[in-house]
Amino acid sequence: IRNKYGFYKKLFVVDLFCHGTAEPFYFRDYLELIDGKVRKIDFRGQSKHERSNFQFVITSDNGILEESFEENIFTKAYAESLIMKKSCFSCKLSENIHVSDITLGDFEWPDRAQERNVRVLHPSIISVNTEYGTKIFDNIKNNLYISDIVTEDEVAFYYRSHSEKGAWGYNIAEKEKFEEDYKKWGFKEAVYRNLFQHEINYLEKIYKYMQ
């Protein structure tokens, strides 16, 4: 924005700590598995459990599907890198190159936030990147529960290369395998084969044993 329009005193730039973006056509494939016409989708539904994370909630003509991110096959496939866009794996803005005034994101360790007296159900992380961002933050910080991040593992979690093999959400090898399976079997079977292959193998052994 600044490269195109220049600097304005009232222009305040915010970006996000991003874990990557899923391919839209995979989401369309997933929605086709839902029974009934989909009326509403909420990726950040409130969990019934106090210490739990957000819920993935879909409202359709036939009822409400409510699952944790670990239970739902779409969000779990996203977390395991299977359905991310290829461009996410070469994104330079995932490292320590943030040109915004402030960067926002979900803080991944609610228990650690509680230990630091940040007593909210869904804590956020805020990175102040510029002098202008500091001025804005100083004007609002008295209305927030704040604790400085001092541990190296927490900082490294948010500033890292998406090309790192095996890092959460950025495993290109897993994505490439899923793409090949998707061509063979379609979305549903490819997801189950990649997320639950160990369980499938175990059930197949039981089935053979019972024959």
Q: What label would you give each PLM region?
A:
Residues 16-17, 110:
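Active-site adenylate/phosphate-handling loop in enzymes that bind or generate adenylated species
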Residues 20-30:
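Short, charged, surface-exposed secondary-structure boundary motifs
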